[in-house]
């Protein structure tokens, strides 16, 4: 009826695909206008040097009717409360940079994903953000399941093929690939 397809029985969650925290990216400009991501994106691209990442004004927070997303004052990035998120998609629709995606949850709610949407070439992306994917391809080579491809200087993970082995996380020199809800890896002392 609505024209949308729904996967029956597949629970989803909102995922923020930006790791460009206050510590990771320079702020070469000062945005003095309305505190709105939509306005900042139209005016001067916001305060950071990354024209792909989070603008930090919280349009996603304002859009969420379930109080499931908050701005982290330390990082300046939105954080999703996994227990409150209903995967309604309001936050994703509110983001002018399209950094929020709805992803399938698995039984243990473990996820591996690229926390960057910057499509600039390596040196340009790295200058904009210390955590930017630079399209080096190390993750592609490390993945034994051929679940990762490079497209427009950015790594993409095929979640149908990914087996959550986290070899890509270990190989990423930029720490652009995130692993969520995994137990800590054993250290040499354990």
Task: Report residues per predicted region.
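Strongly charged, low-complexity linkers/loops
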Residues: 134, 138, 144-156
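Ferredoxin-type iron-sulfur electron-transfer modules and their immediate structural context
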Residues: 1-136, 140-142, 171, 175-190
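Terminal recognition/anchoring or ligand-binding modules at protein termini
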Residues: 166
């Amino acid at each position: 009826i609505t024209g949308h397809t729904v996967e029956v029985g597949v629970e989803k969650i909102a995922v923020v695909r930006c790791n460009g925290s206050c510590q990771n990216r320079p702020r070469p400009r000062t945005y003095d206008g309305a505190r709105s991501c939509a306005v900042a994106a139209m005016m001067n691209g916001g305060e950071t040097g990354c024209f792909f990442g989070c603008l930090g004004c919280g349009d996603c927070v304002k859009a969420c009717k379930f109080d499931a997303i908050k701005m982290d004052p330390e990082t300046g990035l939105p954080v999703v409360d996994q227990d409150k998120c209903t995967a309604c998609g309001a936050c994703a629709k509110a983001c002018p940079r399209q950094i929020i995606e709805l992803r399938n949850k698995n039984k243990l709610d473990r996820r591996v994903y690229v926390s960057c949407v910057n499509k600039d070439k390596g040196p340009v992306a790295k200058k904009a953000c210390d955590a930017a994917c630079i399209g080096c391809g190390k993750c592609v080579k490390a993945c034994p399941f051929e679940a990762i491809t490079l497209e427009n200087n950015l790594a993409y993970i095929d979640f149908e093929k990914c087996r959550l082995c986290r070899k890509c996380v270990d190989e990423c020199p930029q720490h652009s690939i995130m692993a969520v809800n995994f137990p800590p890896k054993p250290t040499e002392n354990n």
